[in-house]
Amino acid sequence: MIRFFSRRLFLKGTVVTLGTLAVNGFSISGHAAPGNVLTAYFSWSGNTRGIARRLHQKIGGELVEIELVTPYSEDYNTCLEQAKRDQERAARPELKTRITDMARYDVVFLGYPNWWATIPMPIASFLEQYDFSGKTIVPFVSHGGGRLGQSVTDIAKLCPSSRILEALSVRYSGGSSLSGDMDAWLGRIGIRS
């Protein structure tokens, strides 16, 4: 099921831009070419990774996984403790992933799991590490029932000079409806064949 951020969030200052950017036969308003699109994602369980790969097949551009210098534990309960502690301290875990020329990207599709109704701290690290001024950020979120939480609002707070488009909300890995849900979402945000 797809959900998007509220009108209230829009009215609080998040700018939604629908222009025309050519991306692998698609277009989003107001931007340039497929090489100017980055799909960056953080995934612990693999759900967000699968969504990111499917999205990348549809839109092209560059695909980058946001990885940590010290990854979270592979054990679910230990990971929960580590990630919750990071959330409580508003930690900014050090990223192993480096984007050498972020300035070349106009549009950043940003994928992450909803942890405690917001972005995981590695996403906060990523958003603070680069200048997103003037860029269009398009969130996509995997979740176990919490949908977007306040994640889009938190992205807008970290990137006040960016345009944020409607987010895609995907329960777990999206199942058999993912491709159709993704196509409908891409159409709503102005990406079309």
Go through each PLM region and give its residues.
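FMN-binding flavodoxin-like domain, especially the glycine-rich phosphate-binding loop
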Residues: 2-5, 33-74, 81-82, 87-193
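Boundary at the C-terminal end of the N-terminal hydrophobic targeting segment
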Residues: 27-32
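N-terminal secretory signal peptides and thylakoid transit peptides that target proteins
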Residues: 1-18
